[in-house]
Amino acid sequence: MSQTYYKAINWNEIEDVIDKSTWEKLTEQFWLDTRIPLSNDLDDWRQLSEQEKDLVGKVFGGLTLLDTMQSESGVEAIRADVRTPHEEAVLNNIQFMESVHAKSYSSIFSTLNTKSEIEAIFEWTNNNEYLQKKAKIINDIYENGDALQKKVASTFLETFLFYSGFFTPLYYLGNNKLANVAEIIKLIIRDESVHGTYIGYKFQLGFNELSEDEQDAFREWMYDLLYQLYENEEN
């Protein structure tokens, strides 16, 4: 009998039921930005002040940056430490959807903004001190952290770092404006809640294997990171 070189994934033998349930959840809620009629928001957009338009553009620019990093670096960083082949399949799904999220913001821009406005948004995003600091803090962990640290960085990004940017479009939705833009944000939030929960769960599995002293030291590192990110958000 020849030696096994590569193993086929068997979805009939599940090592962790959370892998299967997460896969099913993510595939059930699959969506694409092209299905949302963003042009229906043009009347609302024209009624916003220039300051409001500038705010919305910069908020979405920042969110695009985070989704780009997560799709290019974040998922790859935690892929090396998967426990099951099904976990890797889930991460493949997450990585693709992060690219969908990043692309959806460009769909919003192309619908609401002029070419020069879009260029200005990305110029600001790629050079803003605090956005770039946020990206550097997270990406440094992706490049140099251990397996648990990478999962913490990913979970923090998937949760509160994204959610601070979601406030603005949801605020306008609450005022009956930009409903279709907000629909995209709601779909992204639905995805991110699953992404953050899943990666956080995988973190807990590894964290529970640490000694009590190791857990205490890790908690200290984790809260230091949280406060560092929070301080940057305040700026």
Regions flagged by a language model, labelled:
Residues M1-N235:
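Non-heme di-metal
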